[in-house]
Amino acid sequence: VNGIAGIINIFCMTGWWGIYSSKNKQDMLWPDMTWCYILAYDLWNFEYTYNNLPTHSWYCGLALLLAPTFANAFWNKGGWIQNRANTLALWCMFAQVFPLFQDKSRFSVLTSVYADGYMDPTVPPTNADPTMQGVIAIIALVANVCVFASIIKRAKEQKKNPYKNEIFTDQKDYKLALERAAEKARKAA
């Protein structure tokens, strides 16, 4: 289910020719990557970490997804993709340098699958309850299908190729992100 949701999420990335730099040339802006895509991506990526990286699900799966999402929602419109790349890179470097932080320290977190609070890669969990994994997987799949259906509907209504053209141009987030773009980019849009 995770793989299907992930593939659908790739097709939810619209407006590939609408990636701009900000006026001060410090940010990469992708105005068409609005809250619709961000929500679908966050749900899918949390599902991935929750299901496959149990000790990472809190830090990498939730905290790292919320940081760029909050930034995009409140002060960095259009900059979500760059913020996501930065936070992910910082986490990966930290996790490689201090791997025991997430695995064996007092800050380690295990998902409900490991109900007995024990994780050993050589021993399957005896009290495993994968119910939440299935619930999260279905939620992520449904969200990505809904966003993709919305993209198809908008593309047909606007008679646009959603991958070459931006299709969320009527959304407030898109307009605010484009205001941050360099003058040349705004004329092209």
Where are these regions (language model features)?
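C-terminal transmembrane-bundle signature of multipass membrane proteins
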Residues: 60-187
